[in-house]
């Protein structure tokens, strides 16, 4: 006994899309006037990989503590620039985000020929924090030149630009525009799309 059904044509090497006749009609109309994503002039990236989030993603209280442990005003300014706001997949909502007041200690590994690697010796308060996690961070696979550095990220500069982000996995397509300076973590739920129009 058939209660509901729809005819779906699966031609050649095209991806399978199961839609009602009305949805198929809408899809065809969109495809005739739109540009496929593969033809856009964009780059799609994942978020930052830390290898050990417990050490590199911190609360606002921990950030304030690290900043208060800086010995000089110069160290404090450098450290403020190093610790950036971060969003996780679960922070992304439909058309917006709810920042959980979490921060990324962005001890990046640099970009060859363009951006030097972060030298932890220039950030004693950050080093003191990360030293508490030494046994975990020293053996992680996702690390840079030293255990204090995050892994190489060729698109590091793109995290400083405004971007459209969306969760890769979820019940709904949640996407939003993120202002410059906010990083995103790759919790397997997040992709970053840097648009040239910004």
How would you name each of these model-derived features?
Residues 3-198:
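Polybasic, glycine- and aromatic-enriched phosphate-binding surface used to engage nucleic acids
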């Amino acid at each position: 006994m058939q209660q509901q059904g729809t005819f779906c044509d699966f031609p050649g090497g095209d991806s399978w899309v199961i839609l009602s006749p009305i949805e198929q009609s809408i899809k065809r109309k969109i495809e005739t006037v739109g540009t496929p994503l593969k033809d856009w002039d964009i780059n799609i990236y994942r978020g930052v990989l830390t290898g050990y989030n417990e050490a590199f993603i911190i609360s606002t209280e921990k950030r304030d503590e690290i900043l208060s442990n800086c010995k000089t005003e110069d160290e404090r300014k450098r450290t403020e620039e190093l610790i950036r706001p971060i969003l996780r997949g679960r922070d992304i909502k439909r058309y917006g985000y709810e920042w959980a007041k979490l921060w990324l200690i962005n001890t990046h590994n640099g970009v060859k020929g363009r951006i030097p690697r972060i030298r932890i010796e220039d950030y004693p308060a950050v080093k003191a924090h990360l030293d508490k996690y030494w046994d975990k961070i020293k053996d992680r696979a996702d690390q840079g030149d030293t255990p204090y550095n995050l892994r190489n990220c060729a698109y590091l500069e793109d995290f400083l630009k405004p971007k459209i982000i969306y969760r890769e996995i979820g019940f709904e397509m949640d996407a939003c525009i993120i202002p410059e300076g906010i990083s995103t973590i790759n919790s397997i739920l997040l992709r970053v799309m840097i648009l040239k129009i910004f």
